[in-house]
Amino acid sequence: MRYEQTIDILKSQRHYFTHRAHLEIEEKSRANYVTNVDKTIENNIKQALHTAYPHINFVGEEEAVNLAYDYYWLLDPIDGTQNYIKGQYPSMISLALVEKGAVVYAVIYDPYFDVLYTAYKGEGAFQNGSPIHVSTGKMNKAIVMVGTAPYTRNLTDGTFKVAKSIYEHTSDIRRSGSACYDLVQVATGRAEAYFELFVHSWDYAAGLLIVQEAGGVVSDMEGKSLNEMKVGTTSILASNHNIHHELIQLIEANV
């Protein structure tokens, strides 16, 4: 089955990003925010998905999480909420279709530039319909995206120790504030890797499949598979195959 209607559904929310709305901001925990726009976009997409695909369950970041369904949509309405609040780029919409724990279809939408990243399992990854592929870059020439998960300050020392070590062994590091953005940078070859010590399934589900279908590899920081969506949090490392093992060694030596 194809899911082309999801593209129009996600694109229909673009105006929330291109025209600033009145924001009501709630702090769920330290530096972990949700806005009325997060909730509105999630509800809009939920209702549209139910109309288009009534047989598929729905799980969103801003609702109670239940990943026990055999078949469900997994949505992050605004990945990069702090950026959105501050009027900074990037923020993205992430939607994954999960079947028996595995992502089988993914779409990430960049509403600021009207760019879609899509993947069906086993069919490759695409940017606005054109095939994308991870880079073949080596460690000393690599750009690595770094996520800091600012609402988990107990991981601060480990995160920045790893980031420093990676910086010393690569060309440079980047910090965007959006896991989806970081993952599509890897998938398109604009960066060689991305790591973060604390992410939820909705943060990375769509990006995981897109990176894999673009020829990359995704694991936790110990090299274990993240292919099964689970409740809770995990570390994540996405890269081209060339530098994955080297990065795992650097991370393990510094966390």
Region annotations inferred by a language model:
Residues 55-57, 172, 192, 217:
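Residue-level detector of anion-binding/catalytic polar loops
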Residues 1-78:
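N-terminal subdomain of lithium-sensitive/metallo-dependent phosphomonoesterases centered on the IMPase/IPPase/PAP
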Residues 73-113:
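Glycine-rich active-site/cofactor-binding loop and its immediate structural neighborhood
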Residues 1-2, 7-8, 161-167, 184-255:
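Oxyanion/phosphate-interacting regions
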Residues 16-17, 38, 49, 81, ...:
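Residue-level signal for inorganic ion chemistry
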Residues 70-72, 104, 142, 192:
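Conserved acidic residues
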Residues 96-183, 226, 233-255:
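Acidic beta-strand-loop-alpha-helix segment within the catalytic core
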Residues 28, 61, 176-178, 221:
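Conserved beta-strand termini and adjacent loop/short-helix elements that scaffold enzyme active sites
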